[in-house]
Design a protein with these regions (language model features):
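A composition/biophysics-driven feature that prefers long, compositionally simple stretches
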Residues: 1-173
């Protein structure tokens, strides 16, 4: 385990202690910003996303599910692609997300919409950053609708959508 990984896992653990029971944290990365037709601005990760994960790539989402029975830290990220890496730089991919960044599980970002309802099912509370303009709210509505559609088959629909922003401020104080 690398020192950086220990620091980030401690931050996630500190945040987890502040959450209500049966909660899930979802946080999306910043998106790239286009400078002109063939160049992007230098990438800057969302501060809260980086604070909890250390993961510095766009098109990624982290899930923290700290309940005793399902304690998981999951990263959805881009796949490794040697051709794109030649132009845009290194990508950790799913193996790197686990080995370098300490994720319990890692999946391709292309599987996010397919797998997210499964990860949210059974949680009572969903925490997400309401101050990040990354479109996560629209995706959350879609995922919750998918869970509701399966309610007759026993799916448990989360009850509360809560702001992660104030809790992250408290987590900073407690470290």
């Amino acid at each position: 385990m690398k020192t950086k990984e220990i620091d980030f896992s401690l931050r996630r653990e500190t945040l987890s202690k502040l959450l209500l029971d049966d909660s899930v944290v979802i946080l999306a990365s910043s998106s790239t910003k286009v400078r002109n037709s063939d160049a992007d601005y230098a990438y800057r990760q969302d501060s809260n996303f980086y604070y909890l994960s250390g993961f510095n790539e766009p098109e990624s989402v982290i899930i923290i599910r700290p309940s005793a029975r399902n304690r998981k830290y999951i990263i959805f990220c881009r796949d490794r692609d040697p051709l794109k890496e030649q132009w845009d730089g290194y990508r950790a991919g799913q193996e790197g997300a686990k080995e370098i960044y300490g994720a319990d599980e890692a999946y391709s970002i292309s599987l996010l919409d397919e797998l997210m309802p499964e990860f949210l099912q059974g949680a009572k509370n969903i925490y997400y950053s309401m101050s990040s303009p990354n479109g996560l709210e629209l995706s959350l509505v879609k995922w919750l609708d998918q869970i509701r559609a399966n309610k007759r088959q026993g799916s448990e629909v989360p009850e509360n959508l809560l702001s992660l922003d104030a809790l992250l401020d408290l987590a900073l104080i407690h470290i």
